[in-house]
A protein has these predicted regions:
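Anion-binding (especially nucleotide phosphate/pyrophosphate-binding) glycine-rich loop
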Residues: 1-57
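Phosphate/pyrophosphate-binding loops and the adjoining catalytic core of nucleotide-dependent enzymes
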Residues: 224
């Protein structure tokens, strides 16, 4: 299938906006709606109109509109619920524009803009910044295997958000708490659990150093989740979908 990053590169060269912040995300275009991929303030659902897919249950091709995909934070009908795994996505239809992203940006992108005094916010410029930021923090798949971000960010109700703010935990727009921050400030960066190491660059990344089975990964996950629960009273959720 077509790589998502190749599509982003193509669209930014055409000066089209809508997915430039999704630069350098590994994976294919067809997989993007499955997790409703997103980064630096953009999500595929913001531009997605429909997908053309093969229904493995009914054995026929279908078109599924965005409003029927139950898109949410890293989820859709394609990976959650009774229809998970039912559809093989063949192509997607998206609507891009010539509008540009404008400041203030997502935290790390805004910091980069200010540090480097960037004034060009064209899709091509945003792509270049996001790519540099991403590879400064994340291991490149061809150099070190990982599943990417292993834990989802945490969404809170207003009461919980206030509790976390009182603990000096950053709470972003929409009452979102960055799980990477929680793991980092729990002192887990660089630590190993059952052969799985928390990346020194990005706390959301788990790297297999010596784990020999899924059981080791499960133990590592449970240990990290337990530490965060005890320190912050929050339960981290795994982002990668497990195949049975």
């Amino acid at each position: 299938g077509e790589l998502l990053d190749d599509l982003v590169a193509f669209t930014t060269k055409k000066n089209l906006s809508g997915i430039e912040a999704l630069s350098a995300i590994p994976g294919t275009v067809g997989a993007a709606p499955v997790q409703n991929v997103g980064a630096y303030g953009q999500e595929i659902e913001q531009v997605l109109e429909s997908v053309h897919a093969y229904d493995l249950k009914e054995e026929k091709y279908v078109t599924i509109k965005k409003e029927d995909m139950n898109l949410g934070y890293r989820q859709s009908i394609f990976n959650h619920g009774k229809d998970a795994g039912r559809y093989l996505i063949i192509s997607i239809r998206i609507h891009l524009s010539h509008d540009r992203l404008t400041p203030p940006f997502y935290t790390s992108l805004q910091s980069y803009v200010e540090e480097h005094q960037i004034t060009d916010f064209s899709p091509k410029s945003i792509r270049e910044m996001v790519t540099e930021i991403r590879w400064s923090k994340l291991p490149k798949p061809e150099e070190m295997a990982s599943s990417g971000s292993f834990f989802k960010n945490v969404y809170l109700d207003d009461q919980e958000a206030e509790r976390l703010r009182s603990m000096n935990v950053p709470v972003w727009e929409g009452n979102k708490v960055p799980s990477g921050w929680l793991i980092d400030h729990a002192g887990l960066k660089g630590k190993s659990f059952y052969g799985m190491r928390v990346s020194e660059k990005a706390a959301l990344i788990l790297i297999n150093e010596s784990a020999q089975s899924y059981a080791h990964l499960k133990q590592a996950r449970e240990e990290i989740v337990s530490i965060i629960e005890k320190k912050y009273g929050l339960t981290l959720k795994q982002e990668p979908v497990e195949l049975e």
